């Protein structure tokens, strides 16, 4: 499986190329498509049917939607929900960009007694993956920015984060926004 054009992938199965279209970003989503293909192939054994069904299916855009944003920057909107694993997958995606990478992250809710530790792990992971800046919003996101270090900035209110983004974002930035549903991160 490899990328061909924007939002298109090409699969080579049994010496046949199949064009598929998907709005989904990230290696983990491509793996999900491949596992769906294997299931479909075992049940139907018609390679072309899978591509037709996938290409005609409108996947509800709620995860990792890529678009142009403030001042010509690139936005990856992954505001639908967050947990430690999905946040790390999003960080993996963001880390593949060569541009200046900015993670805007809100609290990951409903994590129980290990919530602070799990938030810190996400900050450490972002640092290890080479993310340039982490902007945190929410009480628990402070753990992420502290674990990230010097270029981790915590915001305790919506207006200060919005103001920072408007003032500091450039066309060379790739910004990924992520947070639990309850944080309503899409407002940024």
For the regions a language model picked out, list residue spans one by one.
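Conserved catalytic-core segments of large NTP-driven translation/proteostasis enzymes
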Residues: 7, 15, 31-34
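ATP-dependent carboxylate-amine ligase
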Residues: 23-28, 34-188
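Structural motif
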Residues: 13-15, 17-21, 70
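Single conserved hydrophobic/aromatic residue that forms the stacking wall/gate
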Residues: 1-13
């Amino acid at each position: 499986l490899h990328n061909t054009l924007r939002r298109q992938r090409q699969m080579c199965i049994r010496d046949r190329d199949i064009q598929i279209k998907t709005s989904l970003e990230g290696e983990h989503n491509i793996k999900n498509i491949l596992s769906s293909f294997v299931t479909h192939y075992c049940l139907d054994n018609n390679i072309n049917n899978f591509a037709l069904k996938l290409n005609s299916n409108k996947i509800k855009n709620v995860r990792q939607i890529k678009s142009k944003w403030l001042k010509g920057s690139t936005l990856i909107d992954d505001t639908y929900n967050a947990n430690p694993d999905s946040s790390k997958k999003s960080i993996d995606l963001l880390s593949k960009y060569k541009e200046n990478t900015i993670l805007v992250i809100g609290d990951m809710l409903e994590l129980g007694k290990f919530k602070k530790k799990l938030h810190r792990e996400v900050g450490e992971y972002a640092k290890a993956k080479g993310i340039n800046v982490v902007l945190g919003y929410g009480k628990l996101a402070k753990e992420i920015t502290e674990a990230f270090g010097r270029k981790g900035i915590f915001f305790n209110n919506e207006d200060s984060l919005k103001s920072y983004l408007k003032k500091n974002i450039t066309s060379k930035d790739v910004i990924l926004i992520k947070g639990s549903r309850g944080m309503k991160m899409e407002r940024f």
